[in-house]
Amino acid sequence: MSRRRQNKPRVITPDPTYDSRLVHMFVNRIMKDGKKSVAYRLFYEAINEIREKTQQDPIKVIEQAVRNATPLVEVKARRVGGSTYQVPLEVSPERGTALAMRWILIACRNRPGRTMVAKLTNEFIDASNNTGSAIKKRDEVHRMAEANQAFAKFRF
């Protein structure tokens, strides 16, 4: 860790179509090899499918999915006296959102299916309904933190 100064957080501009920072963050995480236009196309098609399937505002569905998948606590490895403990720590809102987005995208990439659009759509709908792989991952992290609650005294 640098001792000089903390780096400034990046300013994320809102998405031009939906005026949402969350959409822009998702597009940046979907993007591979710098192909942002492809990532935008995938995400916008997924948004249209969400609108057709749920008859709701797709941005609200996506926000609900991220809110549901956001962890409250996580565990970090900490060496104390030659042994490593999994120490539970609270998650900051920014990190929680980043983890939720990462887990949703990992879950949709691991999903069986033909197109990324269909997988992304189904994962968003599942996460907004508190089901799916991203929610399982959040619950698993919460269980780990609860199981290691005795080591909370070793906080950083």
Curated annotation (Swiss-Prot):
Cited Gene3D superfamilies: Ribosomal protein S7 domain (1.10.455.10)
Main location: plastid
Pfam families listed in its UniProt record: Ribosomal_S7
Single GO molecular function: structural constituent of ribosome
Biological processes, Gene Ontology terms: translation
GO cellular component term of the entry, any: chloroplast
InterPro entries, A to Z: Ribosomal_uS7, Ribosomal_uS7_bac/org-type, Ribosomal_uS7_CS, Ribosomal_uS7_dom, Ribosomal_uS7_dom_sf
Taxonomic superkingdom: Eukaryota
Cellular compartments annotated: Plastid, Chloroplast
Record flagged with keyword Transmembrane helix: no
Keywords: Chloroplast, Plastid, Ribonucleoprotein, Ribosomal protein, RNA-binding, rRNA-binding
Assembly with partners or alone: Part of the 30S ribosomal subunit.
Biological function: One of the primary rRNA binding proteins, it binds directly to 16S rRNA where it nucleates assembly of the head domain of the 30S subunit.
Family: Belongs to the universal ribosomal protein uS7 family.
Record-given protein name: Small ribosomal subunit protein uS7c
